[in-house]
Amino acid sequence: MSDVLRLDREMMALALQQARASLDAGGVPVGAVLASGDEVIAAGHNERVQHGDPVAHGEISALRNAGRRASYGDTTMYTTLSPCQMCTGAILLFQIPRVVVGEARTFAGDLDFLRSKGVEIVLLDDLGCVAAMEEFQARYPQVWSEDIGGR
């Protein structure tokens, strides 16, 4: 296993911990980590249910927790689920050059769109990420349908 893939898997494990924290609180299990190399800048998870905030997706929470930055040009966004249109927009707005996705089985997002804008996409197809979303979708189908799952 290459050093890059090893780091990607380590960071995804941190993002999955965030997703599990959201699931344990009755929320949507999407976790995210914003990193520069092996340095974690910030982490977050979906808090839409917990805070009644429709834009508190995992990637957005990680960006909020990162605070202001002059540039995101050296960062990677690790997210347990393929980004929705809103989170895709944030990735493009802040010019995050690399996104590592835990899984795109339970929600495909539009990874080709990100690629077409020059974003490097790595899809890990992590079974832990898949299991967390499948558990959530089975336990809370109505909550999922209120969010991106309703499409």
Tell where the protein language model's regions lie, with residue ranges.
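Short beta-strand scaffold segments in enzyme catalytic cores
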Residues: 30-38
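Local cysteine-cluster metal-coordination motifs and their immediate loop/turn environment
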Residues: 79-97
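Immediate flanking context of iron-sulfur cluster ligation sites
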Residues: 70-82
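A short, polar/charged loop-to-alpha-helix boundary motif
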Residues: 47-61
